[in-house]
Design a protein with these regions (language model features):
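Mobile active-site "lid"/loop adjacent to the S-adenosyl-L-methionine
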Residues: 47-66
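C-terminal target-recognition/interaction regions appended to catalytic cores
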Residues: 192-304
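Conserved Class I SAM-dependent methyltransferase catalytic core
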Residues: 63-120, 126, 131-133
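Flexible, glycine-/basic-rich loop-and-beta segments that form/coincide
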Residues: 125-189
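Conserved S-adenosyl-L-methionine
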Residues: 1-38, 42
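A short acidic (Asp/Glu
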Residues: 1-4, 22-24, 51, 93-97, ...
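Short acidic, S/G/P-rich loop/turn micro-motifs used as interaction or catalytic elements
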Residues: 46-49, 89-93, 191-193, 246-247
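Short, solvent-exposed loop/turn segments at secondary-structure junctions
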Residues: 18-19, 45-47, 89-91, 121, ...
Length: 304
């Protein structure tokens, strides 16, 4: 039903494990077909480097996930457009290498429509995914033009821009917040020297459910979380260390304002500026980085 006049087109079908008699058995990452002057419709494999024993393809494309290897192939081709189904992090990740991949893709192609699926789509992966309709940019159109984005199952429709000013990231303007030089915000670890500046502000970095989302809260001295792991590798919780130290009253006000700011941004951008947490359940769970959380606190402290 997608193509009405099929007789006017030539189709090529490739699959590493063909289920259709017309499909050609082929590993299209190991041995890519020619995409030049073709419309590509596919759902490439998603598999992170650290989940795969074989590192050959990751080394070949200098990528850390198989779907990014495919994206690299598209960028290097003369493809005229297509529809791809890829992890949502392709348009949300704030990793430097991912931003660079997104920039290269956007310089080559114009994104016409994005569909975001916040419920699990595939039985074999809990990744939040999106489908992207793109065409080759032949007119030099503004890379920052708005992209119509549909979100399911809520049926929300938003316009997004992916441009240099927001690091080609949805809601990426938040990473350019002005911050105060007067305050330093970090987290409490076994290496923390200025113990007197350890606050009673606990940062929860991952959504658990609709009723237990990421954010800040005041806790007792006994509930403060100190990262005592060998390599300081804890990423789910952090107790803030603020220099110079601030009073309990100031801490309480900071928690209130920081949570309100995060809620405002999550509503504005449908939480898409936050990294997707793979194990989603009743909601599309998100993760906030220490760096962004500390930046938000520093920004708010500087406003007072």
């Amino acid at each position: 039903n997608f193509i009405q006049n099929k007789e006017d087109y030539t189709f090529e079908l490739y699959d590493i494990d063909p289920k259709c008699e017309k499909a050609i058995k082929r590993d299209t990452l190991e041995n890519p077909p020619c995409y030049d002057n073709k419309f590509v419709l596919t759902n490439p494999p998603y598999l992170a480097r650290n989940k795969n024993k074989s590192k050959e393809l990751y080394d070949k494309y200098n990528c850390n996930d198989l779907y990014k290897c495919f994206i690299t192939n598209l960028i290097d081709s003369n493809c005229i457009g297509g529809i791809i189904i890829v992890p949502l992090n392709f348009i949300c990740s704030i990793r430097k290498a991912d931003i660079e991949l997104r920039r290269a893709f956007l310089e080559k192609f114009t994104l016409n429509t994005i569909n975001i699926f916040e419920e699990q789509v595939f039985d074999d992966t809990s990744y939040a995914v999106c489908s992207i309709h793109f065409v080759k940019n032949t007119t030099g159109a503004d890379i920052a033009s708005k992209i119509k984005t549909h979100i399911y199952p809520s049926n929300k429709v938003i316009d997004i821009s992916l441009k240099l000013e927001n690091n080609y990231t949805i809601g990426g303007e938040i990473y350019n917040l002005p911050v105060s030089c007067e305050y330093k915000v970090e987290r409490a670890t076994k290496s923390t020297k200025n113990k007197e500046n350890i606050t009673n502000i606990l940062l929860k970095c991952i959504d658990d459910s609709l009723d237990s989302q990421l954010g800040f809260k005041m806790v007792s001295d006994e509930e403060r979380y100190i990262d005592n792991t060998e390599n300081l590798s804890a990423r789910s919780y952090a107790t803030l260390v603020i220099t110079p130290n601030i009073s309990i009253e100031q801490q309480t006000l900071l928690v209130k304002k920081a949570n309100a700011f995060i809620t405002e941004q999550r509503t504005k951008y449908n939480s898409l500026f936050l990294t997707n947490y793979r194990e989603s359940n009743t909601i599309a769970r998100k993760r906030i980085s220490f760096e962004l959380a500390f930046m938000i606190c520093n920004h708010i402290l500087g406003l007072n």
